[in-house]
Swiss-Prot record:
Record motif RxLR-dEER, residues: 50-65
Signal sequence range: 1-21
Entry-linked InterPro entries: RXLR
Presence of keyword Cytoplasm: no
Predominant localisation class: secreted
Gene Ontology CC entries for this record: extracellular region; host cell cytoplasm; host cell nucleus
Similarity-based family: Belongs to the RxLR effector family.
UniProt organism field: Phytophthora infestans (strain T30-4) (Potato late blight agent)
Functional description taken from the UniProt entry: Effector that enhances P.infestans colonization of Nicotiana benthamiana leaves.
Protein name per Swiss-Prot or TrEMBL: RxLR effector protein PITG_15972
Keywords: Host cytoplasm, Host nucleus, Secreted, Signal, Virulence
Length: 94
């Protein structure tokens, strides 16, 4: 029974804290209006065409992401057929 009360209090505290963290809609609208200057909106349209994104074609660099390159190189070195052949040659020498 105590667990139910503790859970209810935790939910109530979470909801109260999350609702007090949000600004009121009246304040939010005034902040949005003050943050949109006309020069930003005009710069999105050039020559009657809306610019969504600018790409730099000069530098096309490819990045290695994650462990893909190192993992592939390591897997190339791990060839079980070569390892078995080397082990067989080593055992024949002894």
């Amino acid at each position: 029974m105590r667990a139910v009360y503790i859970l209810a209090m935790a939910c109530a505290a979470t909801l109260q804290a999350s609702s007090s963290a949000l600004p009121s809609t009246k304040d939010l609208n005034s902040q949005v209006e003050s943050l949109v200057p006309s020069d930003i909106t005009d710069s999105a349209h050039v020559g009657g065409v809306r610019l969504l994104r600018v790409e730099d074609k000069e530098e096309e660099t490819e990045e290695e992401r994650g462990f893909g390159g190192a993992l592939a190189d390591g897997l190339k070195k791990l060839n079980p057929a070569k390892a078995a052949k080397k082990a067989k040659e080593k055992s024949c020498e002894n």
